[in-house]
Structures are given as structure tokens and as C-alpha cells.
Amino acid sequence: MRPPMTLKGVRRLRDELEHLKLVKRPEIINAIAEARAHGDLKENAEYHAAREQQSFIEGRIKQLEGELSHAEVIDVAKLNAGTKIVFGATVTLADLGTDEESRYQIVGDLEADIKQGLVAISSPVARALIGKQEGDTIVIEAPAGRREYEVVAVEYIS
């Protein structure tokens, strides 16, 4: 099965790939050429650091190309799931213990970033939410203990 990814997530990875290819790669090539011009490569720390950075960048480029070529891109705006929670849904939850609300979007594993409210489809939170609807209650076993949440809203925002 191909890993799912939102259209927004694909754009972000493509932007990173383009930046690496068009900006970072040429910078490293220039840094290597400049370090080479300094002479003896055996004891040239600048040269070795630039080569190491080149290796890292080329590895990241290959990784991004592979991820993008295998991803199943899902346009969240075109989903018609109503109030049912599926991949791509943006869900507002109310903690039944504290009445605090939080908002998460269920995204692919490669684009997850909890600080931005993006939870991976494979995470315990997302697994508990999939298939639920507005008004449903879910229980999540968190490191801090068992938490109960009510699904307040389900939206499909691109």
C-alpha cells in the first residue's frame, strides 16, 4: 500500500526538494571547489566538511524523491466524508477532564508535526479518531494517563 499524503504535505516536500537541488547543491559544489583550491586534501578540514554535507544533501534528495514517487496524494478539499473522520480530516476535540479544546489534522506519517497540529495516520490519536463522528467520545491512553475527548467538529480543509 502506498503511504497517503495530503496535497499540502506533497507541496511542502516538493519545495524542500527544489530548495536542495537549486540552492543547497550548488552552494556545496562551490564550497568543495573552493576548498580544493586550498591545496592538500588529506588535511583540509573545509573540504572534508563540505563533502560530508554534500553526502547528507544528496541522501536527503534521494529520500524525498523516493517518498514523493511512492506517495498516494489525497486532496482533502475533494473528500466527501461528511462528519465522519477519515484521513485528512481536521478535528476539534474537547478534553472531557479539563474542557480544553485542541485541533488536529490527520496526515501521512511523512508530514506529521505535532507542533503544527498535524498527527500521523498511524498515531494512537488518529487511530482512535478514524471512523468516529461529531459528538462521539474517544479514549486515548497517553503517557500521562487515560484521557477522554469528545469530537466537537470535523472539517475537511485543504
Swiss-Prot record:
It comes from the Bacteria. Keywords: Coiled coil, DNA-binding, Transcription, Transcription regulation. Residues 45-72 form a coiled coil. GO terms for biological process: DNA-templated transcription elongation; regulation of DNA-templated transcription elongation. The keyword Transcription applies. One of its GO terms (molecular function) is RNA polymerase binding. Belongs to the GreA/GreB family. NCBIfam families: greA (TIGR01462), PRK00226.1-2 (NF001261), PRK00226.1-4 (NF001263), PRK00226.1-5 (NF001264). Necessary for efficient RNA polymerase transcription elongation past template-encoded arresting sites. The arresting sites in DNA have the property of trapping a certain fraction of elongating RNA polymerases that pass through, resulting in locked ternary complexes. Cleavage of the nascent transcript by cleavage factors such as GreA or GreB allows the resumption of elongation from the new 3'terminus. GreA releases sequences of 2 to 3 nucleotides. This is Transcription elongation factor GreA. It comes from Xylella fastidiosa (strain M12). The gene is greA.
